[in-house]
């Protein structure tokens, strides 16, 4: 196995020292590509299978069947069609552009995405707790944030039940398990 194929090591990003592009934009684009590719690598052959819920599978399903999606307006469908055309039907490139808008604009409460892509990104690429608390006052995000909070609390409850069962059986929580719990609690 090549070192670049190992999934259990930390990610490393390299950026040029001299560049004409804004470094923040470059980092956001790189993180979007990284999120897409790491999800593909973790999911394996099921990265595009909607039965296995993941960032890539839901986003591919959304882009493949946008014409039949009743949640999208005619204008949103036309924008997505143009985005797919500009990206030469490369779903990753469309995702990266949406991810850039998500981080740069939507995190500040400025609407750039349609309802479906916003919902997918909130599920798999949520904002920090501070940003989520700021956005709760915004009516466009209230439903999404409430749904996210419910899903998070269910995950925490499920993890705590497994951990309690593990402790009762004589197990001891190591640092990785505690970090995992902290991740779901944020």
Stretch-by-stretch model annotation:
Residues 4-186:
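Active-site-flanking segments in enzyme catalytic domains
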């Amino acid at each position: 196995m090549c070192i670049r194929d190992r999934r259990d090591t930390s990610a490393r990003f390299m950026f040029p020292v001299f560049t004409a592009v804004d470094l923040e934009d470059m980092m956001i684009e790189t993180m979007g590509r990284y999120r897409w590719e790491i999800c593909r690598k973790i999911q394996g052959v099921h990265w595009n299978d909607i039965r296995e819920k993941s960032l890539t599978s839901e986003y591919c399903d959304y882009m493949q069947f946008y014409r039949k999606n009743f949640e999208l307006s005619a204008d949103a469908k036309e924008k997505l069609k143009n985005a797919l055309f500009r990206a030469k039907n490369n779903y990753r490139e469309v995702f990266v552009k949406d991810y850039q808008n998500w981080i740069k604009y939507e995190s500040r409460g400025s609407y750039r995405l349609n309802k479906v892509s916003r919902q997918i990104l909130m599920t798999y690429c949520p904002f920090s707790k501070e940003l989520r608390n700021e956005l709760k006052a915004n009516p466009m995000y209230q439903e999404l944030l409430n749904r996210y909070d419910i899903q998070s609390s269910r995950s925490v409850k499920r993890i705590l039940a497994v951990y309690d069962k593990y402790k009762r059986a004589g197990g001891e929580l190591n640092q990785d398990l505690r970090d995992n719990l902290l991740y779901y609690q944020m």
